[in-house]
Amino acid sequence: MVKIRLMRMGRVHYPLYRIVAVDSRVKRNGKYIALIGHLNPALKENKCKLDETVALDWLNKGAIPTDTVRSLFSESGLWKKFIESKNKKETSPKK
């Protein structure tokens, strides 16, 4: 199962995080499949930068975001786009 989660980088007392798609069995800082974005919690504005196309691609493939990543997606508006695209697929008529 593929999860979208945070991978800690940075120094002591100055964390930086990468948002990555990774196999759920891999350790926290292990090898990742795709880099989706990064997070700098020390900044007050623009702390999260995402590649929306890559993130939506992995979400559509069935990757499951952690609670923290889901809240970051909600703040950026990405989660709403994903839900809308998912609802369009379900309501579209089958031929």
Curated annotation (Swiss-Prot):
Family annotation (Gene3D superfamilies): 3.30.1320.10
GO molecular function, one term: structural constituent of ribosome
Keywords associated with the record: Ribonucleoprotein, Ribosomal protein
Biological process annotations from GO: translation
Ribosomal protein is among the record's keywords: yes
One Pfam family, short name: Ribosomal_S16
Gene ablation phenotype (knockout): Probably essential, it was not disrupted in a global transposon mutagenesis study.
GO cellular component, one term: cytoplasm
Coiled-coil region(s): none
Family to which the UniProt record says this protein belongs: Belongs to the bacterial ribosomal protein bS16 family.
Name the record gives this protein: Small ribosomal subunit protein bS16
Organism: Mycoplasma genitalium (strain ATCC 33530 / DSM 19775 / NCTC 10195 / G37) (Mycoplasmoides genitalium)
Protein encoded by which gene: rpsP
